[in-house]
Amino acid sequence: MNRRDLLRSCAAGIPLTIVSGARAPQMYWAGTPQRIVEAMLDLARVTAGDVVYDLGSGDGRIPIIAAQKYGARGVGVEIQPQLVRRSRQTARDGAVDDRVTFVEGDLFKADISAATVVTLWLNDRMNARLEPKLKTELKPGSRVVSHQFRIGQWVPAQTSHVDDVDLFLWVVPEHAG
């Protein structure tokens, strides 16, 4: 990937893994705007009974807003330790640390079986890699919302367009895995 494409991807907020001769990949992150976060959670029809998992949770704003605005429980999975620390502090500052947990780890290895809602802002390739995990680990009726990117060949149940951003909703069917 050339420098211009990298900068364009980062400016667009696309989390991007770059392997450039280093042993560990570099992860880039940009936060989802509040209006988009709320639109994603509204699209998933989040309620106080939900457990919202955000895969690649960055600064934790999606699980935190899910707890603050909707009364849901939230779990953020993030590989960057400094973002996990920041998320935990923000949850404490927002008085939702009793309902929100942040896990430092690889989203492909995380146990997501307790989720009723999963949110994503990854990219096409990562979403496609996640598709089998989502379909096998999530219970039927669980909702998945992606900011900007589709999930493989999985057909969305609903789409929304907010501030020039496409949002996609999928509902896990019976016998998905």
Which role does the model predict for each range below?
Residues 88-110:
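S-adenosyl-L-methionine
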Residues 1-17:
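N-terminal secretory signal peptides and thylakoid transit peptides that target proteins
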Residues 49-56:
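Conserved class I S-adenosyl-L-methionine
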Residues 32-48:
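Conserved alpha-helix/loop element of class I SAM-dependent methyltransferases that forms part
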Residues 60:
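Glycine-rich SAM-binding Motif I of class I
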Residues 73-78:
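Conserved SAM-binding motif I beta-strand of class I
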Residues 126-177:
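C-terminal substrate-binding/active-site "lid" region of AdoMet-derived donor-dependent transferases
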